[in-house]
Amino acid sequence: MVDGRGNAYVNTIGFDFPGGQFAPGIIALVTPDGAVRQVADGVAFPNGMVVTPDNATLILAESYGNRLTAFDIAADGSLAHRRTWADLVGGYPDGICLDAEGAIWYADVPNQRCVRVREGGAVLQTVDLDRGCFACMLGGVDNQTLFMVAATWDGPASMAGEQRTGLVLSIVAPAPGAGWPSHG
């Protein structure tokens, strides 16, 4: 994920998926000059990331942690003051996107849905699907269309199958996209 300053944040899950023994992952920072350094560790299957429009906060989906985690971003791109942005009891956040009201949409594969939450975890809206939701992004002409990437998910073994069940679905969202990755 590239922020408004040109910094790229890259995460790794920390173990071989599927089938490997769980181990926490990391977030690495790649600066515009090509320097690379680790800026966070101990994250539980890190997935989607967003940065607020002011480039002050990075929010990470921790799929195995059932939460969205926030970090303050320093001027040099370092991450500090780790905290839970939203505890998603029973939710497994995958891809995420941020809207102009400060809410986050998260894709949830095993629960076959895309959910909009505010900081603290209050659920604002749920879009139930008939298959797993892997990614979401706000875009379109007015940046107010929520696009959802969904496919049938029968566990890790289904990744090697010949099924062709993927769809891109969309709805009109209550607020336009904001922050990074760029939605426009």
Where are these regions (language model features)?
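Glycine/Thr-rich phosphate-binding loops of Rossmann-like dinucleotide-binding domains
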Residues: 18-19, 68, 114, 156-157
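Blade-level signature of beta-propeller repeat domains, shared across WD40, Kelch, NHL, RCC1
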Residues: 137-184
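Loop/turn-rich, solvent-exposed surfaces of beta-rich toroidal or solenoidal domains
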Residues: 66-73, 78-82, 86-122
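Conserved beta-strand positions in repeat-built beta-propeller and related beta-rich domains
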Residues: 2, 8-19, 58-64, 104-109, ...
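Beta-rich, blade/repeat-based domains predominating
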Residues: 1-8, 24-26, 36-57, 87-103, ...
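Conserved active-site loop/cleft motifs that coordinate metal ions or position small ligands
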Residues: 106-107, 115-116, 124-127, 135-137, ...
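A short loop-to-beta-strand structural motif that recurs across blades of beta-propeller domains
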Residues: 25-28, 67-69, 113-115, 167-169
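Beta-strand initiation motifs
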Residues: 30-37, 75-83, 121-125, 176-182
